[in-house]
A protein has these predicted regions:
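Conserved C-terminal segment of the DHp
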Residues: 7-22, 26-30
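Short conserved segment of the HATPase_c
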Residues: 10, 146-158
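Short alpha-helical segment of the dimerization/phosphotransfer core of two-component systems
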Residues: 33-38
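Helix-loop junction within the histidine kinase core
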Residues: 49-60
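Conserved catalytic submotifs in the C-terminal HATPase_c
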Residues: 59-64, 81-95
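Short alpha-helical Gxxx[C/S/T] motif in the catalytic ATP-binding
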Residues: 171, 175
Length: 207
């Protein structure tokens, strides 16, 4: 594992010595990927600090769930590894929840990002369903799964599925805190080698 800043500095130097366009493009992609990761780390730290200080603002309103899912389907369909299918399951297109649009996007994006990272083959499914007075969201994958020893700590700060895969270790902590601030809860079911299923709930808005 190479920290993002080290990679940015290192490949910025290497690109000046690159002789072919292919080599320059390869280094540019690495720099861009690690720059995005570093920006995400800064944003995660800022959001965590705001949540802990109880100063993060939420714009709570009724949200049509299918609109969020269609946006995320378009955003993530090309980010899966070769041959992996991203599938938005059949859902109630008229279902609403109460929450902050941007924060719900942030939560599901984090779960989908993890699923694409840890699913080298098979399928990733996501969607939602009604559960009493709540909407239950889910992201299910056929990836590497999570060792039992890590499940208990995965939503704690710096809890990671795999120490050798790049990531901030803050994303799932943020997901938990954001979900709880909007009146829900988050959990997972997983078995090593058999994929993972992440769930979270938010209040259901009856039309």
């Amino acid at each position: 594992y190479v920290p993002p800043l080290n990679a940015i500095v290192g490949f910025s130097k290497l690109i000046t010595y690159a002789t072919s366009a292919e080599e320059k493009n390869q280094y540019s992609e690495i720099i861009e990927r690690n720059s995005e990761m570093l920006l995400n780390l800064f944003n995660d730290i800022l959001d965590l600090a705001s949540l802990e200080a109880d100063s993060l603002k939420f714009n709570i309103r009724p949200i049509k769930l299918i609109d969020i899912c269609l946006q995320l389907e378009q955003q993530f369909w090309h980010k899966t590894q070769n041959g992996v299918k991203l599938i938005l399951d059949d859902v109630d297109t008229d279902m609403y929840t109460s929450g902050d649009w941007n924060r719900i996007i942030q939560i599901i994006s984090n779960l989908l990002s993890n699923a694409t990272k840890f699913t080298p083959k098979g399928e990733i499914h996501f969607g939602y369903r009604e559960k009493e007075d709540f909407v239950e969201f889910y992201v299910k994958d056929s990836g590497i799964g999570i060792p039992a020893a890590r499940i208990a700590t995965i939503f704690r700060r710096f809890g990671k599925v795999d120490d050798f895969v790049q990531g901030t270790g803050l994303g799932l902590t943020l997901c938990r805190m954001l979900v709880e601030k909007m009146g829900g809860r988050i959990w997972l079911r997983s078995q090593e080698g058999q994929g993972s299923r992440f769930y979270f709930t938010l209040p259901l808005v009856r039309q």
